[in-house]
UniProtKB/Swiss-Prot annotation:
UniProt-listed NCBIfam families: tig
Gene that encodes it: tig
InterPro entries: PPIase_dom_sf, Trig_fac, Trigger_fac_C, Trigger_fac_C_sf, Trigger_fac_ribosome-bd_bac, Trigger_fac_ribosome-bd_sf, Trigger_fact/SurA_dom_sf
Name the UniProt record assigns to this protein: Trigger factor
Superkingdom of origin organism: Bacteria
Gene Ontology biological process terms from the UniProt entry: 'de novo' cotranslational protein folding; cell division; chaperone-mediated protein folding; protein transport; protein unfolding
Keywords noted in UniProt: Cell cycle, Cell division, Chaperone, Cytoplasm, Isomerase, Rotamase
Catalytic reactions of this protein: [protein]-peptidylproline (omega=180) = [protein]-peptidylproline (omega=0)
Main subcellular location: cytoplasm
Alphabetical list of Pfam families matching this protein: Trigger_C, Trigger_N
Gene Ontology MF term list: peptidyl-prolyl cis-trans isomerase activity; protein folding chaperone; ribosome binding
Organism name: Chlorobium phaeobacteroides (strain BS1)
Coiled coil: none
EC number: 5.2.1.8
C-alpha cells in the first residue's frame, strides 16, 4: 500500500491510496462469493454462477463496493499512523482499477494545526450581585401580582397603571379614517417602552381626559397618522396582603409562613444571580479567546453548529420557523455565530490537550455527589447510574471537561470582581 497526503487548505486534505492486487483481490473474491449466493442468471442454478459471469454482469457494482470498503479501512489505519484528526467523514472522490493496482482518492476536513496564544495577561471583570431586602420585596411583589386586583382610581395615571381608552384614527389631513375606531382598548403602561408615543402621552392623564398621539411612518415618505385617545378609566394594581394563607396558596403549601417563603425567595435570587455571574464570566472568557485566536474552522463543524442553532430556534417557536421566515435566510444570519461556536470548540479542545485533561469515572461520581448535595430530593447513587448510562455518559464527559477547561483558564488569568445591583425585570 502506498499513500500520499496533500494539504488543500488549513482544514482540508486529500489522501491518495494505491493498493496492489494482493491487497484488493481478496475483497473482490469476497464480493463475488456474496453475489453468487443471490444472483440469478438464466441457464445457471442459484449459487452456481461462474465467477467470470458474475464479474461481467456486476463488475462496476463490485468494484464500487470494494473501493468503498477499502477506502474506509485504510483511511482509519492511515489516520492513526499519521496522526490525522478528521473533522468530517472522508468522501470517496474517485477510484480506478488499472490492472494490478487500485487507486483511491479521498477528500476530508481536518482539525487545523495551531497553538493557543498565551493568555496569562488576560483580565476579566466578574459582576457580583448582592441580594438586598429591597430586591426580595420586589421579587415577592412580582410573584403576588398574579393574585392582585386592578381597581379604578381618580388620580392621574402612573407609569405602571393600566388605561382603558377609546381611539379614533386620523390621516395626515386630519380626516377620520372610516372603520378605524377602537373602543375599550387596554394600555398596560408598565410594559410599553418609555419612548413609546402612547406611553408618553398617557402617563399623568385622568379619566375623562383626551389626548392626541402622532405616529410617524417608519419608512421615509410613509404617511403619518394621528390618534385621538379618550381616557375612560385608569386602573391600578392592588397587591394582596402577604400572609401565611396567601403563602400557602402561592407555594402550593410548600411553605406555611411568610418568613419561610421570604427566605426561599432570597435563596432563589442568590442562586440565580450567582449562576448569571458565572455564566456571564464564562461567555466573556470564550469571546476573548475567539477574538484573540482566529483559528480556521472546518465548514462541516460550522454546519453542525448551524444546524443546532436552527433546531433550537424551531423548538423555541413550537417546532418550526414562523410563516414568512426563510430557513436559508435564518441560516445565513446565524452562520457567524455558528463559526464562533466551532472556533471555541477547537480552542477549548487544544487547551484540554495541552493540559492533558481527561474525565474519569471518579470525576463523574464526584459530580453526581455534588449535585445530590445541592438537591436533597436527588439520590447520589441513582444519579451516578444515570450519568454513567449510554445515553448520558458522553454528555456528562463533555460537561465535566468543559468545567476543567474553564478552571485551567480562570487559574491563569486575572479576574476582578465588581459589585453590581440586581438588574430590573418586570416579570
Amino acid at each position: 500500500m502506498q499513500k500520499n497526503i496533500n494539504n488543500v487548505s488549513d482544514t482540508e486534505q486529500k489522501l491518495e491510496i494505491t493498493l496492489s492486487a494482493e491487497e484488493f483481490t481478496p475483497e473482490i473474491d469476497l464480493e463475488v462469493e456474496n453475489a453468487r449466493k443471490t444472483i440469478q442468471i438464466k441457464g445457471f442454478r442459484k449459487g452456481h454462477v461462474p465467477a467470470g459471469m458474475i464479474k461481467k454482469v456486476m463488475g462496476p457494482a463490485i468494484e464500487a463496493s470494494v473501493a468503498e470498503k477499502l477506502a474506509s479501512k485504510y483511511f482509519v489505519e492511515i489516520s492513526e499512523s499519521e496522526n490525522i484528526k478528521p473533522a468530517s467523514r472522508a468522501e470517496l472522490e474517485n477510484y480506478s482499477f488499472d490492472g494490478d493496482t487500485l487507486s483511491i482518492t479521498l477528500s476530508y476536513e481536518i482539525h487545523p494545526d495551531f497553538e493557543v496564544n498565551d493568555f496569562k495577561d488576560y483580565t476579566f471583570v466578574q459582576d457580583i450581585y448582592a441580594v438586598t431586602d429591597e430586591d426580595v420585596e420586589k421579587e415577592i411583589n412580582l410573584i403576588t401580582k398574579g393574585h392582585g386586583t386592578l381597581v379604578p382610581v381618580e388620580t392621574p395615571a402612573e407609569a405602571k397603571d393600566t388605561i382603558i381608552a377609546d381611539l379614533e384614527k386620523y390621516d395626515d389631513s386630519g380626516n377620520i379614517i372610516e372603520g378605524q375606531k377602537t373602543e375599550n382598548y387596554s394600555f398596560n403602561l408598565e410594559y410599553l417602552p418609555e419612548d413609546n408615543p402612547f406611553h408618553n402621552a398617557l402617563v399623568g392623564k385622568k379619566s375623562g381626559e383626551k389626548v392626541t398621539v402622532d405616529i410617524e411612518g417608519k419608512e421615509k415618505g410613509e404617511e403619518t397618522y394621528r390618534y385621538e385617545v379618550t381616557v375612560k378609566e385608569v386602573k391600578r394594581l392592588e397587591l394582596p396582603e402577604l400572609n401565611n394563607e396567601l403563602v400557602k396558596e402561592i407555594s402550593q403549601e410548600k411553605f406555611d409562613s411568610v418568613e419561610d417563603f421570604r427566605t426561599d425567595v432570597r435563596g432563589q435570587l442568590e442562586q440565580h444571580f450567582s449562576n448569571k455571574s458565572e455564566q456571564d464570566l464564562l461567555e466573556s472568557i470564550s469571546a476573548r479567546f475567539i477574538e484573540e485566536n482566529p483559528v480556521p474552522t472546518p465548514s462541516s463543524m460550522v454546519d453542525s453548529f448551524e444546524n443546532m442553532l436552527l433546531e433550537n430556534a424551531k423548538r423555541q417557536m413550537g417546532g418550526q420557523l414562523p410563516p414568512g421566515m426563510d430557513e436559508n435566510g435564518f441560516r445565513d444570519s446565524v452562520r457567524p455565530n455558528a463559526e464562533k461556536h466551532a472556533r471555541w470548540m477547537l480552542i477549548s479542545q487544544k487547551i484540554a490537550e495541552n493540559n492533558s485533561l481527561e474525565v474519569t469515572d471518579d470525576d463523574i461520581k464526584a459530580y453526581a455527589e455534588n449535585e445530590a448535595e445541592k438537591n436533597p430530593e436527588l439520590n447520589a447513587e441513582e444519579l451516578l447510574k444515570t450519568y454513567m448510562s449510554t445515553e448520558f455518559r458522553d454528555y456528562m464527559t463533555d460537561t465535566i471537561l468543559k468545567d476543567k477547561i474553564y478552571t485551567i483558564i480562570k487559574s491563569s488569568v486575572t479576574i476582578n470582581a465588581e459589585n453590581k445591583p440586581l438588574p430590573e425585570h418586570k416579570g
